Swiss-Prot record:
<feature type="compositionally biased region" description="Basic and acidic residues">
    <location>
        <begin position="17"/>
        <end position="27"/>
    </location>
</feature>
<feature type="domain" description="PRONE">
    <location>
        <begin position="35"/>
        <end position="401"/>
    </location>
</feature>
<dbReference type="InterPro" id="IPR038937">
    <property type="entry name" value="RopGEF"/>
</dbReference>
<dbReference type="GO" id="GO:0005085">
    <property type="term" value="F:guanyl-nucleotide exchange factor activity"/>
</dbReference>
<protein>
    <recommendedName>
        <fullName>Rop guanine nucleotide exchange factor 10</fullName>
    </recommendedName>
</protein>
<dbReference type="Pfam" id="PF03759">
    <property type="entry name" value="PRONE"/>
</dbReference>
<feature type="region of interest" description="Disordered">
    <location>
        <begin position="1"/>
        <end position="45"/>
    </location>
</feature>
<dbReference type="GO" id="GO:0016324">
    <property type="term" value="C:apical plasma membrane"/>
</dbReference>
<feature type="region of interest" description="Disordered">
    <location>
        <begin position="400"/>
        <end position="423"/>
    </location>
</feature>
<dbReference type="InterPro" id="IPR005512">
    <property type="entry name" value="PRONE_dom"/>
</dbReference>
<comment type="function">
    <text>Guanine-nucleotide exchange factor (GEF) that acts as an activator of Rop (Rho of plants) GTPases by promoting the exchange of GDP for GTP.</text>
</comment>
<keyword id="KW-0344">Guanine-nucleotide releasing factor</keyword>
Length: 493
């Protein structure tokens, strides 16, 4: 059977020598790429069918009905896809072309679901008679219509940022096992011990490279900020599960603890001072603080809603509605600061509970997509900061060497100056020359003495002629002695 698509019903193709070649031979030699393209499309279709079959069954291929909800299945699919694509992104380098293509292709499959998440909106339609009639038409949901294009743009910015490091030669990476010999295995104590070590030139990065890296970091920081905002907004719109509410204590003070509750409920509250005063040295402590604050916020919100509904709280409380709103604002401010200070912090108990119990497919897609972009942006920022930190370390070493060299040069200059002065004045004057002494012939024999010893000896010789013998001193008579010689006349009898 032949294919006659080229020229009517002809089964042959003409050649320049007048001979004819069967069409199937041309297909075998001239279109291998076409066959490969068809095979790729067929394999893509098979992969997509398998992927969506798992999603429809909730990852339960047995069909027993024990699978996850569609929302959670989509959320997990996006999370697993991002882990497989970006999990090995340990260096500042472009993604492999195949990896990038697979990421965009499979994300396109998963995001195609949102085309069917619509809402009814009123519209006007002109009839045949020229009159307008109000009808209801479908439109993509507002949150998806706004946030999905924004997330796609953030996705493209992050991939372009990685592509910008394609031809850079200002820094490079060394495996950790090579550093092990130099540091005697101390690198395993580092929290990121699995990452390769960044190396920069011995004189550090150039000023141009440093500015370029800082610009890349600022760009990624904007992406991180936008993705975090979208993720936080979507999570705030999700319903709080009942099983999470049942696990909460009766009041926010019990959830926070005495110290945190007293700090948040004081009259004067400074969030910056409060966060700086806390012990946030480990990831576990940060996550524990986040869980406590979120639990107290849920408790306060429920009490406020119950008080507005019934006029009083079912749990009973002496705290006014206005103060509870103020406490909630303060707690939310602390949460925002924690997310900004620790962008890679794990999900809290409330967030995990919301994601697991969520049944809105659109919210599940928005939350998971923004979360994986937030994680990728945080990872890229951390890799850029590693390069800048390596450069700062080299700069500090150079400054220390320069200071040491300047001190040694100053000491050597001082020593050379002393030598020059000593060479110019060979006959140095002694202490006796400055005082004005003149050595006589009698004292020249003592020239071997030191100046201080000679000084004391001369002073003793000066004092000797001034001391006269006691015999040479004139006898002194006191006034009382004179009176003693003048006695009263004795009686003459």
């Amino acid at each position: 059977m032949f294919d006659g698509r080229n020229s009517g019903h002809s089964s042959f193709s003409s050649r320049g020598d007048g001979m004819h070649t069967p069409e199937h031979e041309l297909a075998g030699h001239a279109a291998p790429s076409t066959r490969r393209g068809k095979q790729n499309r067929r394999s893509d279709m098979e992969v997509m069918k398998e992927r969506f079959a798992k999603l429809l069954l909730g990852e339960d291929m047995s069909g027993g009905g024990t699978g996850e909800t569609s929302a959670l299945a989509l959320s997990n699919a996006i999370t697993k896809l991002a882990d497989s694509m970006f999990g090995e992104q340990m260096k500042l380098q472009p993604m492999y072309p195949e990896t990038k293509e697979n990421w965009r292709k499979e994300m396109g499959w998963l995001l195609s679901v949102i085309d069917h998440i619509v809402q009814f909106v009123p519209s006007r339609q002109m009839g045949k008679n020229g009159q307008f009639t109000e009808i209801m038409v479908t439109k993509q949901r507002d949150d998806l219509l706004t946030n999905i294009p924004a997330l796609r743009k953030l996705d493209s910015v992050l991939l372009e940022t990685l592509d910008n490091f394609k031809d850079q030669k200002d820094f490079w990476y060394v495996p950790r096992d090579m550093e092990d010999a130099d540091h005697n295995g101390d690198w395993r104590r580092d929290e990121n011990w699995w990452l390769p070590v960044v190396k920069v030139p011995t004189d550090g990065l150039s000023e141009e490279s440093r500015r370029w890296l800082q610009n890349q970091k600022d760009s990624v920081a904007q992406v991180l900020k936008a993705a975090t905002a979208i993720n936080a907004h979507v999570l705030s719109e999700m319903h709080v599960p009942e099983n999470y509410i049942d696990s909460l204590p009766k009041n926010g003070k019990t959830s926070l603890g005495d110290f945190l509750y007293k700090s948040i409920t004081e009259e004067s509250f400074d969030p910056d001072y409060f966060v700086s005063f806390l012990d946030l040295s480990t990831e576990h402590k940060v996550l524990d603080l986040k869980n406590r604050i979120e639990a107290s916020m849920v408790i306060w919100k429920r009490k406020m809603c119950q008080k507005e509904k019934d006029g009083k709280s079912q749990w009973g409380s002496t705290v006014s509605l206005e103060k509870r709103e103020l406490f909630e604002v303060r707690a939310e401010t602390i949460l925002v600061m924690l997310k900004q200070q620790f962008p890679g912090i794990p999900q809290s108990s409330l967030e995990v509970s919301k994601i697991k119990n969520n049944k809105d497919v659109g919210q599940a897609i928005l939350e998971s997509y923004s979360r994986v972009l937030e994680s990728l942006a945080s990872k890229i920022m951390s890799r850029i900061e590693d390069v800048l930190e390596a450069d700062r370390l080299v700069q500090r070493q150079l400054m220390g060497e320069a200071e040491t060299r300047s001190e040694s040069e100053a000491e050597s200059e001082y020593e050379e100056t002393e030598k020059v002065v000593a060479a110019e004045t060979p006959n140095s004057r002694k202490l006796s020359d400055f005082i004005g002494w003149r050595l006589s012939s009698d004292t020249k024999k003592h020239s071997s003495m030191s100046d201080i010893e000679f000084f004391h000896k001369v002073e003793q010789e000066k004092e000797k002629p001034m001391m006269k013998s006691p015999r040479a001193l004139p006898k002194k008579f006191s006034y009382l002695a004179k009176l003693e010689n003048m006695r009263s006349p004795s009686d003459r009898h």
